[in-house]
């Protein structure tokens, strides 16, 4: 924008630089200039265009005057001509169309034959191809007319483009039929001689018309082809069956309607979508769902209709068009009715059709958009008064805050820091302390209001330096306010402004004049990386005078007031910063936002979501409630503009607090109202009246101030998060489950809620009721914060998902393939009309017709139709290259004809069109792509393609086929391909040169531009980049073999790959041309280069075929086919110059697998079978059953550390270094290289970084790096197939492959096998009309060639690494300092349990190696005492060591010493000297000698304790002879000198921050230098605390003692008499089975009586016991009293005991016996004899209670348990009693076997021979089970107190000849017998204390006796909702919600009342059954109470029944 040269300033940018938008103002300007009267609207544009038109319009005017007479023609607007232009069939191109189609069929035949050959589908004898269903002779007119129309208009445009290339700014005049066109790039005219009308429009309008014709042709062509195929064989064509005649009628009706209604008519077209939506709802939903929506919609349409005429008349007032007549309301209404009828007929009740039509509306053209109008609409929206509800806003803020808290807890295991904790209630403070949050169910609105008051402290920070990621945002920006006039053509501005503007630009810096963010930085010579932060911190952006918001037309929907706003670069960077901070720090807490997902992710998410909500999967919940579900899709009107400061700030403030900023996140709301909003569209200048400062210009259309709302696209992320929080609130209020996906205002919400169905409420009604209720709630919620739901675009459905325009119903996604191919045509998506890119676009777009099991044939026909057109027709006259392309193509074809010796020219073309582009053919879609889409290796695939192609070409000789591959292999080496090209894709044969050339062009262009950049950062980096890029190759130049991916990895691990990003970004086609020249024109040199590139590409095949070296050997398989894999490898290795390159080949499934349709499963292959039984599965889509297939990334283990701390760059750098280590593993010198790279980029040594690096696990580097893995696009559409080999590890083929390749990563070969198999199923079904039931893919071993990983030789050249890393500028990642490293390596204790990957060595103190942890902690503890003592002496008044004496007895003294030494060094070595010196170590040890002797006295006192002494003796026997503390001191110091260093546990506080910072720094230095130490952390405040926790964590006690113990524990003095205690136990009833039938066919239960009971009545007589009550069920004296008498044991061993109740009973029965007690130290159960202590009163009779044992040693299934069983008691295990609950039978047997092993090997037990018994609990199984060898069962006891339905029994086992265990049947049988014949005994005495404890734990405050009065009192308590009782204990579990409490409590009270009122009866099952049957609310009782609670309830019930009079 150089102001001195007027011509460059005033570049005419036509509206075509805005994609797809047709500018109203420009059209108006053109017309007004030509007519000298306002054209479309009388506004300022018309005025300036008449007075001072731009020079281009004047030229156009002159041309018109000379070439066309328009004076007597009627002037109309462009849309009025649309109907006539579309119907203007000038010449019929039917013959051309037939030619293209015929050729397309021939070319497709070859491809089809290839498919059939590979799939082994033989054609039948009459040999008619399916392609013959497409009859070229009968192409309907509704296809051919569109082709002719498009062809003619396209010809005109191409002719114009050719002219323009020769002479810029040329004007072309041509007539087409009855129309005459004048075309120029800055305005066009059409004149109709038929209707005597004339119209003016922009070049874009013409292009749009051309595209519309093309789209209509493509749509109709697909419809016709598909229907012809489907008529003859169902399933060949597409799934939709639209009617071409009708689509044609639809186009015509709409065109006619638009031609009458002018531009305003498009507002009707916009409503069609809604109409189709209502049709879709009518198909998928029940009437009540769709009617409402339909009515709203039709009302909307008629509303629009009534407004049309007024709108139009208002606009054309006092213009040329004023007198044109406007149609009557009735006329338009009739046309509208026709259109809708047409749509309805087209849809024909078929969802596929509806989905397809939903998109077809791009086929009617685009409206012209009036920018000023759109802007006025924005202005109006923002002036609306909003009424906001404060409470709603507060709830919204609370929900937002809760999300952040949840996010912190989930990610960082803590809450964010809070300033004002006191605003929280007790309950929330509890969560805060517990570092947790409540579940959704526990929340209420009140909580949100409470949380809203929280204020956070800063958790994240604004980056210090401007980050490259920000600079690389290539966004558009506006000129600053004083230069805003640069936007408009200078002619349009008054003189005064022009002059002042010249002055201003002259003084302005370059960076202010640009319109892109990137250039704003590039051209800034004062750029300072730290500036942005100070700009933010000082908040200058809030008062910046240069701020301006300019709105331009960018969106298609401008008509409804969506504007695209731009602001100057300085402010734009603030916004980029805010967005980036949100995206990095806060968006992760809101997973529902779709802003962060790519397309494939989205597709997967949608598939999962629709699968979940599908009607077919609706279920009832466990309480048999129907789960009502509905889905709501909302669209909010003017979502962005409805946000005001008030609504944004409530959440923005929270974000500000977290980032420590002020108003950074809603700054726009603070500043925009003070700013002028101006319409910055070129042809819409404001009326200035000569005023330069736009703040002083009066408001007018297109310029206003005081903009209140948000601006489209500016705070999207924040607003989306607010919307999510709002839905959180709604969900809590309605107690509904909501799943939502949101993207700004477009929300898809699923709601579900259980309901009870009743008479009038069926499932549909329940769903509907829920949907309406929720919609109302959502609407109200939005209304309260000032938003309005759009009626026409908000709908509810039971099962229809619709988001970002993808329709899914019943869990099935409806692909809309036609939509995707509307745009296919020649020269698409190219700037320089490159033939190769264009062909690739055609290929990939047409493939959309194949994916998801659509039609492969339609895809082939359409693709080849356009490719043939492109190559054989369009290339004859290329706008840039003239005839050169066609000549080159002819040469190539001739060489093909000669080489393959083909007679007919057509066959040559067919063949060439099927040779893949990689070899210079014409086929952009390699064969494999129709079957699987992730390719490991293009080259192999291309070779396989050619192999199959030549196989089916019958007219080519075999020798020729082989010689083709020889020619391929004899391709000459490429001299110019160096490392640079390796950086790109080394896959295709011709690509090296191309890659080299393009990358050269880009690099030179960009680096030269960058190096001239005034911005120091960029210029330095450009020079650095160009200098160093080649040198990277040198680093690894001596390493062989050369390995492209390795080089790539090396390249990326050197930090300047960020520089490459800049280069690539700038060299992207668009921006490079913009940089090279100011306009979007392209210069001659570019054109020449592009043309020569195209010629090179087209000539590749003839170059390949020109040389054939006959001596080359071609590898051939036994069956005569080639081995493609090897050819590919050889080719790749030989086509590079002087490098031994490792071939990264990977087999192609198309050649390495044979497809066999067989049902025998013994075939060694991969089996894929169909899941459904239908003959075909077309149409019913979606896997409803297991779907197999996954897209795998390389597996890597990421070490566990706190990743939050690192920046994104640091994480990327670590990843790159990890990859580097992985690839070059084992290469000499690798460590040094890595060390240099680490120091250069991260600033710390490799050694320290090592624990942070990810570790890759795959064996085969080669493939893992080269397999690019993309998920298949299949899942939701193909019918469900499954594969029997979920993994190939088990498949028989695996054997064969493993034998051949060793244990290599074979799965790689099969990466694609499954998705391929599924596609095959689908394709076979299309081609044959039936679906194979099963197919097997059999690998051919010769073809599978897995490379071993390369063994690298040679050394790295380090010298350059220093140079490259020291040259770093903006690109180097941040350095990591040692302290951060320390923080990162600290997994908190909590994190460990969950992480399954946690390597045992990663964190040394993980609590499982107790001895080591203990020793280390003790050593640290003593060191702590030492350092404390050095600081202050008085600490030793109390003996510190004593508390831990017993712990010292278990330590490992060696570790103790090592840790002591290391810790000492860290505490004392902090004098700042270098740690390396040995002296420092000695110094700190010498210092010990001088330490006060009080310490040594104390220390030695502990160490000389007898048990500790024994332990130390193991380390050094000399210890025995030491006397006195002096001797100890000398000995200890001597030992210390020789000790090694060792890792230390460090202490952190509750926040997770380190406590001893100084020492830690030294420790980190130690790590860096020598040791292989790891950092470990314990989160406690001091070592003594940590120590106790460590040990107690292993012991039991901490959770059992929390339960309130109501027992006589307090007065332990009175010794309780055991025999009297026995009366509290009830008498026991049992049956003893001695000999029993063990056959498994034992009929189940011979008794007919079967009790139907729901409650655990076996607890009825156990009311005297609280914690456990096994003793009420089983008794030693009653069961095996005789045995006890015989053996007379002194000690009984109870293992697997819980709270020790059985032991207590035994203690009462045998007062003299002592006990050994073992219980599994599991957190879930008691591991302390609590009940025993309660009953007996003290523990003196338990001689070994398992104190101090770890978890393994208390687990009876572990050997260590039995080894330590005699650690105290030296008595034999005469009788061992086991009451353990084992997970499964195996564990029971483990225990038995270990018991047997023990008693047969232990020297104490063996003295008793075989007279040892095990009395154990066992759950019988159905089958016959043998006991382990040499263990026999003597008797089985069935207890009355066991669960009735279970199969629990107690067996007495001894040593002897093994026999069988009883089976389920007999146990059941004798259980029933006992149940029928016996009553339960009640205990003789009642223990009131226990009963009271039971009552209280059941219902707090329940007292005994339980009578009517007591229950009434309880009821009264319930109704008084007092605060303090809201937290109470019910059955031992805390319950917070008072509602639940009342629910549970009232349930309990009801039951107790029922018991109170029932009669007294005998305690037997008949009576219990009667009790249950007479109680009406059984189900409620069982649903509301947990297991434990029910047991308590039965105990209390038993007490009530017993105490009845």
UniProtKB/Swiss-Prot annotation:
InterPro entries named among the record's database cross-references: L_methyltransferase_rhabdo, L_poly_C, Mononeg_mRNAcap, Mononeg_RNA_pol_cat, Mononega_L_MeTrfase
Main location: virion
Variant or mutagenesis effect after changing residue 745 to A: Complete loss of polymerase activity
Catalytic-site annotation from UniProt: 1263, 1673, 1779, 1817, 1848
Domain Mononegavirus-type SAM-dependent 2'-O-MTase: 1662-1852
Domain RdRp catalytic, first and last residues per copy: 628-811
E.C. numbers: 2.7.7.48, 3.6.1.-, 2.7.7.88, 2.1.1.375
Effect of mutating residue 1696 to A: Impaired cell-cell spread and/or viral replication. Loss of 2'-O methylation activity but not G-N-7 methylation activity
Annotated positions binding Mg(2+): 635, 745
One Pfam family, short name: Mononeg_mRNAcap
Keywords: ATP-binding, Host cytoplasm, Hydrolase, Magnesium, Metal-binding, Methyltransferase, mRNA capping, mRNA processing, Multifunctional enzyme, Nucleotide-binding, Nucleotidyltransferase, RNA-directed RNA polymerase, S-adenosyl-L-methionine, Transferase, Viral RNA replication, Virion
Free-text cofactor note: For RNA-directed RNA polymerase activity. Mn(2+) can stimulate de novo initiation but it is inefficient at supporting elongation of de novo initiated RNA.
Subcellular location field: Virion; Host cytoplasm
Residues annotated to bind substrate: 1696-1700
Requisite cofactors: Mg(2+)
Taxonomy, superkingdom: Viruses
Catalytic activity: RNA(n) + a ribonucleoside 5'-triphosphate = RNA(n+1) + diphosphate; GTP + H2O = GDP + phosphate + H(+); a 5'-end triphospho-adenylyl-adenylyl-cytidylyl-adenosine in mRNA + GDP + H(+) = a 5'-end (5'-triphosphoguanosine)-adenylyl-adenylyl-cytidylyl-adenosine in mRNA + diphosphate; a 5'-end (5'-triphosphoguanosine)-adenylyl-adenylyl-cytidylyl-adenosine in mRNA + 2 S-adenosyl-L-methionine = a 5'-end (N(7)-methyl 5'-triphosphoguanosine)-(2'-O-methyladenylyl)-adenylyl-cytidylyl-adenosine in mRNA + 2 S-adenosyl-L-homocysteine + H(+)
Location of the region described as GDP polyribonucleotidyltransferase in the Swiss-Prot/TrEMBL record: 902-1379
Described purpose of this protein according to its UniProt entry: Responsible for RNA synthesis (replicase and transcriptase), cap addition, and cap methylation. Also performs the polyadenylation of subgenomic mRNAs by a stuttering mechanism at a slipery stop site present at the end of viral genes. The template is composed of the viral RNA tightly encapsidated by the nucleoprotein (N). The viral polymerase binds to the genomic RNA at two different sites in the 3' leader promoter thereby initiating either genome replication or mRNA transcription.
Domain comment (free text): Contains an RNA-dependent RNA polymerase (RdRp) domain, a polyribonucleotidyl transferase (PRNTase or capping) domain and a methyltransferase (MTase) domain.
Oligomeric form and interacting partners: Interacts with the phosphoprotein (via C-terminus); the association of P and L forms the polymerase complex.
Recorded family membership: Belongs to the paramyxovirus L protein family.
Protein's recorded name: RNA-directed RNA polymerase L
Source species: Human metapneumovirus (strain CAN97-83) (HMPV)
Phylogenetic classification of the source organism: Viruses, Riboviria, Orthornavirae, Negarnaviricota, Haploviricotina
Name of the gene: L
